Amino acid sequence: MFYGGAMALMQDDIKRVFAYSSISQMGYLLFGIGSISTLGLAGAEMMYVSHALGKGLLFMTAGVLIVQVGTRSLSKLGGLGSKLPITAVCAVIGALTIMGVPPTSGFMGEWMLFYGVLETALEEGNDVRSLMFALGLVATVLTMSYLLWMLKRVFFGKLPENFSKVKEANWYMLSPMMVLAGFTIVLGIYPDIFLQKIMPYMQGVSGG
């Protein structure tokens, strides 16, 4: 979680930011699985789905930037929210999903995952698990840092003069992004759509 997050903060290539972010997010899955609790396992499964939705949105955002702007270098970007409004909204939803902010599916997944880890730590009275829980919270702050930093550099600030003629992507590129954005919000508001299917299996795995 920490290595991927720290490396993401140091990248200029937006695709590399998302690639290192994926490494960090896989750490969350192992974090939840390691709790061996029903909620922790279910949270890890939900995080897996949320990561697919959120990171899919972010990589599609990178694709729009490459096609419409011609670069994926963060140091050359800025102020594109006014030129790519739909892309910007979808990118924000994708980032919120990865950060675990409501009303996206990432919130419920992350909440269940951390609750499961804390539950196991309290039941066992294990200081190591309690420390891991605290470190997980710190890693979440790191996740928020590199994603907010990315959004600021791409969509906010001053628009470079050479981007004055940039236009929003066509609907062939935007439609899939809007579908994924819709899925993550619907799943965030109605998590039982997913949880009712997987909870019995997670209870069987955890022995709960």
Each model region followed by its residue ranges:
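Cytoplasmic/organellar membrane-interface segments at the starts of transmembrane helices
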Residues: G81-T87, M144-G208
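Hydrophobic transmembrane alpha-helices and their helix-loop junctions in integral membrane proteins
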Residues: M1-K152
